[in-house]
UniProtKB/Swiss-Prot annotation:
Annotated protein name in UniProt: Imidazole glycerol phosphate synthase subunit HisH
Ranges for domain Glutamine amidotransferase type-1: 7-211
Record pathway: Amino-acid biosynthesis; L-histidine biosynthesis; L-histidine from 5-phospho-alpha-D-ribose 1-diphosphate: step 5/9
Any single biological process term in GO: L-histidine biosynthetic process
Quaternary structure, from the entry: Heterodimer of HisH and HisF.
UniProt xrefs under PROSITE patterns: GATASE_TYPE_1 (PS51273)
Subcellular localization: Cytoplasm
Gene designation per UniProt: hisH
């Protein structure tokens, strides 16, 4: 199979939301591949890391497919979705029935802990508003936009937060470092705003992302 010049590869992690993520991208562009093939992933213009379930099970799947080191070495734009974002951190406190923390990909220096919902129901499920930054992933996304969330664990606010949300506490709705970006919400379930965020990601390649990140912020 020949690799196209402008391709998006969704990593086949075996998770349940692969189809919905793929369909969301296919509504915007045709060149979307779901694969765990190392050569295809490395050659892609951009890569998506989806995930649902527990961090431990998801990381075990990546290890079984020998994908951990490959993902850590990617230089093109990479988008983690929901659990995919959480796997980009250093450590997750979501034990998934184990007694130890889950070591993650270590791409963004922050951790995952249980969401302090201040007595509100968990998981945090449904539509909620975000406060986005000037990061190119959120180009044209107004403050207060609603996106769809389903999660019980969260990444705290830090220098790597590029969008925030509040549910009991304020947490990172999206994080980024260099070419790695992650969103806690489900853009594939978030109607027009979610599609716009995916379109923003599809507009990125290594050169354009590097240029955007080097622009001075007003």
């Amino acid at each position: 199979m020949n690799q196209a010049d402008n391709s998006t590869v969704i990593i086949d992690t075996g998770c349940a939301n692969l189809s919905s993520v793929r369909y969301a991208f296919e509504r915007i562009c045709s060149d979307v591949i779901v694969s765990d093939n190392h050569d295809l992933i490395k050659a892609a213009t951009r890569v998506v890391l989806p995930g649902v379930g527990t961090a431990g099970a998801a990381m075990a799947s990546l290890k079984d497919k020998s994908l951990v080191g490959l993902i850590q070495g990617l230089t093109q734009p990479v988008l983690g979705v929901c659990l995919g974002m959480q796997m980009m951190t250093q450590v997750s406190k979501e034990h998934g029935g184990r007694d130890i923390d889950c070591e993650c990909l270590g791409l963004i220096p922050t951790d995952v802990e249980e969401l302090n919902s201040q007595g509100q129901p968990l998981p945090h499920m449904g539509w909620n508003q975000i406060s986005p930054s000037m990061h190119p992933l959120f180009a044209g996304i107004p403050a207060g936009s609603y996106l769809y969330f389903v999660h019980s664990y969260r990444v705290p606010l830090s220098d790597y937060t590029i969008a925030s949300c509040e549910y009991g506490e304020t947490f990172s709705a999206a994080i980024a470092k260099d070419n790695f970006m992650g969103v806690q919400f489900h853009p594939e379930k978030s109607a027009a705003i979610g599609s716009k965020i995916l379109s923003n990601f599809l507009a990125l390649d290594k050169a354009s992302l590097d240029a955007a990140l080097q622009e001075p912020k007003s």
